[in-house]
Design a protein with these regions (language model features):
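A short beta-loop-alpha structural element at the N-terminal edge
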Residues: 2-16
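Glycine-rich phosphate/pyrophosphate-binding loop shared by adenosine-nucleotide-utilizing enzymes
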Residues: 3, 53-57, 83
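Conserved beta-hairpin
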Residues: 44-58, 62
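Conserved acyl-donor/pantetheine-binding loop and adjacent beta-alpha core of acyl/acetyltransferases
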Residues: 59-87
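Residue-level recognition of the GNAT/N-acetyltransferase active site
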Residues: 86, 91, 124
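Conserved acetyl-CoA-binding loop-helix of GNAT-fold acetyltransferases
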Residues: 90, 96-109
Length: 124
Protein backbone atom coordinates (compact mmCIF):
# COMPACT_ATOMS: atom_id res chain seq x y z
CA UNK A 1 0.00 0.00 0.00
CA UNK A 2 1.51 3.30 -1.12
CA UNK A 3 -0.04 6.43 0.41
CA UNK A 4 0.99 10.06 0.04
CA UNK A 5 -0.44 13.54 0.46
CA UNK A 6 0.66 16.06 -2.14
CA UNK A 7 -0.49 19.33 -3.70
CA UNK A 8 -3.47 18.80 -5.99
CA UNK A 9 -3.18 19.54 -9.69
CA UNK A 10 -5.80 20.70 -12.16
CA UNK A 11 -5.95 17.17 -13.55
CA UNK A 12 -7.11 15.96 -10.11
CA UNK A 13 -10.11 18.29 -10.03
CA UNK A 14 -12.68 16.15 -11.88
CA UNK A 15 -12.01 13.21 -9.57
CA UNK A 16 -12.11 15.55 -6.58
CA UNK A 17 -15.55 16.74 -7.74
CA UNK A 18 -16.74 13.12 -7.74
CA UNK A 19 -15.38 12.55 -4.23
CA UNK A 20 -17.05 15.76 -3.12
CA UNK A 21 -20.38 14.67 -4.62
CA UNK A 22 -20.17 11.34 -2.78
CA UNK A 23 -19.66 13.22 0.51
CA UNK A 24 -22.88 15.27 0.29
CA UNK A 25 -24.57 16.27 2.66
CA UNK A 26 -21.45 16.53 4.88
CA UNK A 27 -20.14 19.04 2.31
CA UNK A 28 -22.00 21.20 -0.17
CA UNK A 29 -22.19 20.45 -3.89
CA UNK A 30 -19.57 22.12 -6.09
CA UNK A 31 -19.54 22.58 -9.84
CA UNK A 32 -16.45 22.75 -12.06
CA UNK A 33 -16.22 26.54 -11.88
CA UNK A 34 -16.48 26.54 -8.07
CA UNK A 35 -13.80 23.87 -7.60
CA UNK A 36 -11.54 25.73 -10.03
CA UNK A 37 -12.07 28.93 -8.02
CA UNK A 38 -11.18 27.14 -4.79
CA UNK A 39 -8.14 25.62 -6.48
CA UNK A 40 -6.91 29.07 -7.50
CA UNK A 41 -7.56 30.72 -4.11
CA UNK A 42 -6.67 27.99 -1.63
CA UNK A 43 -3.54 28.32 0.45
CA UNK A 44 -3.59 24.55 0.89
CA UNK A 45 -5.30 22.23 -1.62
CA UNK A 46 -3.88 18.73 -1.30
CA UNK A 47 -4.91 15.28 -2.50
CA UNK A 48 -4.47 11.96 -0.77
CA UNK A 49 -3.18 9.27 -3.09
CA UNK A 50 -3.42 5.56 -2.35
CA UNK A 51 -1.98 3.15 -4.89
CA UNK A 52 -2.06 5.75 -7.70
CA UNK A 53 -5.66 6.83 -7.03
CA UNK A 54 -6.94 10.03 -5.39
CA UNK A 55 -9.02 8.93 -2.39
CA UNK A 56 -9.31 12.23 -0.52
CA UNK A 57 -8.60 15.93 -0.43
CA UNK A 58 -8.37 18.87 1.95
CA UNK A 59 -8.93 22.51 1.02
CA UNK A 60 -7.90 25.39 3.29
CA UNK A 61 -8.18 29.10 2.61
CA UNK A 62 -6.23 31.96 4.11
CA UNK A 63 -7.13 35.61 4.65
CA UNK A 64 -8.12 37.62 1.61
CA UNK A 65 -9.97 34.92 -0.31
CA UNK A 66 -13.03 35.93 -2.27
CA UNK A 67 -15.33 33.37 -0.73
CA UNK A 68 -19.03 33.74 0.00
CA UNK A 69 -19.20 32.02 3.36
CA UNK A 70 -20.38 33.70 6.56
CA UNK A 71 -18.25 31.25 8.55
CA UNK A 72 -15.09 32.14 6.63
CA UNK A 73 -15.91 35.85 6.92
CA UNK A 74 -16.31 35.52 10.71
CA UNK A 75 -12.70 34.36 11.00
CA UNK A 76 -11.44 36.90 8.49
CA UNK A 77 -12.96 39.76 10.50
CA UNK A 78 -11.25 38.59 13.68
CA UNK A 79 -7.84 37.25 12.69
CA UNK A 80 -4.99 38.45 10.50
CA UNK A 81 -3.49 34.99 10.12
CA UNK A 82 -5.42 31.74 9.91
CA UNK A 83 -6.14 28.70 7.80
CA UNK A 84 -9.83 28.01 7.25
CA UNK A 85 -10.54 24.39 6.42
CA UNK A 86 -13.24 24.60 3.78
CA UNK A 87 -13.62 20.85 3.50
CA UNK A 88 -11.92 17.53 4.01
CA UNK A 89 -13.21 14.48 2.15
CA UNK A 90 -12.09 10.86 2.29
CA UNK A 91 -13.60 8.25 -0.03
CA UNK A 92 -16.22 6.36 2.05
CA UNK A 93 -14.56 3.02 1.31
CA UNK A 94 -11.34 4.29 2.95
CA UNK A 95 -12.78 6.06 5.99
CA UNK A 96 -11.76 4.87 9.44
CA UNK A 97 -8.16 4.18 8.43
CA UNK A 98 -6.56 7.30 9.89
CA UNK A 99 -6.33 9.24 6.63
CA UNK A 100 -8.16 12.24 8.09
CA UNK A 101 -5.63 12.36 10.94
CA UNK A 102 -2.83 12.23 8.36
CA UNK A 103 -4.35 15.23 6.57
CA UNK A 104 -4.71 17.25 9.77
CA UNK A 105 -1.13 16.43 10.79
CA UNK A 106 0.16 17.59 7.40
CA UNK A 107 -1.90 20.78 7.64
CA UNK A 108 -0.53 21.48 11.14
CA UNK A 109 2.98 20.95 9.80
CA UNK A 110 2.26 23.37 6.92
CA UNK A 111 0.84 25.98 9.33
CA UNK A 112 3.92 25.68 11.53
CA UNK A 113 6.28 26.12 8.59
CA UNK A 114 4.37 29.21 7.44
CA UNK A 115 4.06 30.58 11.02
CA UNK A 116 0.25 30.57 10.80
CA UNK A 117 -0.97 30.51 14.43
CA UNK A 118 -4.46 29.07 14.00
CA UNK A 119 -6.36 26.49 11.99
CA UNK A 120 -10.11 27.09 11.88
CA UNK A 121 -13.15 25.32 10.49
CA UNK A 122 -16.91 25.06 10.49
CA UNK A 123 -18.30 21.93 12.10
CA UNK A 124 -21.32 20.22 10.55
Amino acid sequence: MFCKIQPSTETDLLHILELNKAAIPAVNLLNEMEIQNLFLQAVYFHSLWLNQEVIGFLIALGPGAIYNSPNYRWFELRYDQFLYIDRIVIDPSHQGNGFGHMFYDKLKEFAGQKKIPRITCEVN
